[in-house]
Regions:
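Short, surface-exposed polybasic-aromatic patches that bind anionic ligands, especially phosphate groups
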Residues: 4-27, 31-183
Length: 183
């Protein structure tokens, strides 16, 4: 069992021995990397499964200063994303479709690449967020031609948070090693 300390101080027990079907990620807990000259360690993972059938890994990176970043992994694409989300007006997101442009608070327009709904999730290691109300969460994946990335998560109450980041090449993160995949 893994102790996951949540943002409200509540700890929840999750079985870390659960197998993750179709887990083809080269990453795993306790690997270290370097991002913008700062050393990080992978301390947690949230693995989302979407109704459409695919998975997204959200790796929690921590540095020695107690700062966090998310490393998103989906479709063999990686993005370093801010840990804290920024509130966004839900009315801006109504009737959006893939291919549309969405202007965000950082004065950039993003292309809406995908709209997906979470089906379930699994947790490994430490995650400082509460995930009790994950069902029904919609995720909008956005990008720019400059390799900027944004993810907008919308909960059941139409609260929307945008997480800004940038697309990265996994080799540029200088991981100390990779998980060995069988097969």
């Amino acid at each position: 069992m893994t102790d996951n300390r949540c943002s409200d101080g509540v700890s929840s027990k999750r079985d870390s021995a659960l197998t993750l079907p179709e887990d083809l990620s080269p990453l795993e807990l306790e690997l270290t990397c370097i991002w913008k000259d700062i050393h990080y360690e992978i301390i947690g993972r949230i693995r989302y499964k979407y109704l459409e059938g695919y998975y997204r890994n959200q790796w929690l990176l921590a540095n020695s200063k107690g700062q966090y970043k998310w490393l998103l992994e989906a479709y063999a694409l990686y993005a370093i994303v801010d840990f804290e989300g920024e509130k966004i007006d839900y009315s801006l997101l109504k009737n959006q479709e893939p291919g549309n442009l969405i202007g965000l608070s950082n004065n950039q327009s993003y292309s809406l690449d995908a709209i997906s709904e979470f089906k379930s999730y699994m947790i490994e290691g430490f995650t400082p967020v509460m995930l009790n109300n994950i069902k029904g969460v919609i995720s909008l994946e956005l990008s720019t031609t400059k390799f900027d990335w944004a993810t907008i998560d919308i909960d059941q109450k139409q609260n929307a948070l945008v997480y800004f980041g940038e697309i990265v090449d996994l080799k540029d993160l200088n991981f100390n090693k990779f998980r060995q995949l069988n097969g």
